[in-house]
Amino acid sequence: MALELLTPFTKVELEEEKKESNRKQIGILGGNFNPIHNAHLVVADQVRQQLGLDQVLLMPECKPPHVDAKETIDEKHRLCMLELAIEDVEGLAIETCELERQGISYTYDTMIYLTEQHPDVDYYFIIGADMVDYLPKWHRIDELVKLVQFVGVQRPKYKAGTSYPVIWVDLPLMDISSSMIRDFIKKGRQPNYLLPKQVLDYITQEGLYQ
């Protein structure tokens, strides 16, 4: 994996590297997915297409390594909603290793596990431009960048910089958040068109976020 490459990084270069190595190129989009929404799906799909990845894995976290722990629903509901959201969607799948491992979901531990399980795969870890600024604070970041290629998602013309190797992908801003959807539901408003209909139907059926 070419960790020395910085922005700009073209799809053509990535495709050439892929052809030469014959290794699988897999993206990872981690998150709480509480619930999953359309912006998550657009990011995963567009990164897959723009970088020519074989697949993008949506990876629900167990406990995020944040000081302010997030309030979240049971993992079985988050997983069911993920399954519904990507049903019949090409190129997207689910990775559950962090849920199975339990405890705090450190990306370093996850990538050690995945690279040992799948030594023929190059992993691309997708994060927002705002998270790029926090890379120096990530757990064992200097070792982590040797295991995974970071992909930063930014708005067109948005300028972000980092000393760490990051591939940049431009995407239009979609101002959708899980907290917004939860707030809509709590207030009795239907978050139509913000998340897949089958996910909204599941939320209604299970009485979530009331």
Curated annotation (Swiss-Prot):
An example Gene Ontology molecular-function term: nicotinate-nucleotide adenylyltransferase activity
Domain of life: Bacteria
Lyase in keyword set: no
Biological pathway: Cofactor biosynthesis; NAD(+) biosynthesis; deamido-NAD(+) from nicotinate D-ribonucleotide: step 1/1
Database matches in Pfam families: CTP_transf_like (PF01467)
Keyword entries, A-Z: ATP-binding, NAD, Nucleotide-binding, Nucleotidyltransferase, Pyridine nucleotide biosynthesis, Transferase
InterPro entries reported in the protein's UniProt record: Cyt_trans-like, NadD/NMNAT, Rossmann-like_a/b/a_fold
Entries under SUPFAM superfamilies matching the protein: Nucleotidylyl transferase (SSF52374)
GO-annotated biological processes: NAD biosynthetic process
EC number: 2.7.7.18
Record field: catalytic activity: nicotinate beta-D-ribonucleotide + ATP + H(+) = deamido-NAD(+) + diphosphate
Stated family: Belongs to the NadD family.
Annotated function: Catalyzes the reversible adenylation of nicotinate mononucleotide (NaMN) to nicotinic acid adenine dinucleotide (NaAD).
Name this protein carries in UniProt: Probable nicotinate-nucleotide adenylyltransferase
Organism: Streptococcus pyogenes serotype M18 (strain MGAS8232)
